[in-house]
Design a protein with these regions (language model features):
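A compositional/biophysical signature of low hydrophobicity enriched in polar/charged and small residues
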Residues: 1-82
């Protein structure tokens, strides 16, 4: 999970992030982070390349906080996007 703060329009940056193949979902949020996104990487090297090499290079990205899942206790998906 990535918590991203931005200096410019979060909607524009979220759209750009959503184009990355590793990104599962992107949401605009209220609170400390402007954007939250879940990413799927093969290993820590892949995650490092994604965060440092691509996401932090997007114009307007201020900070990226990475939280890795240690254990998934529950995941339910029953709603649609329409």
């Amino acid at each position: 999970m990535l918590a991203i703060t931005v200096e410019t329009d979060a909607r524009v940056i979220a759209e750009e992030i959503s184009e990355l193949a590793e990104v599962d979902y992107v949401v605009l949020t209220s609170g400390r982070a402007d954007i939250l996104c879940e990413v799927l990487c093969n290993d820590s090297t892949h995650l490092l390349e994604l965060v440092n090499g691509r996401i932090r290079e997007i114009r307007g990205v201020r900070t990226v906080e990475v939280s890795t899942y240690l254990r998934l206790l529950k995941q339910t998906y029953t709603w649609g996007t329409g």
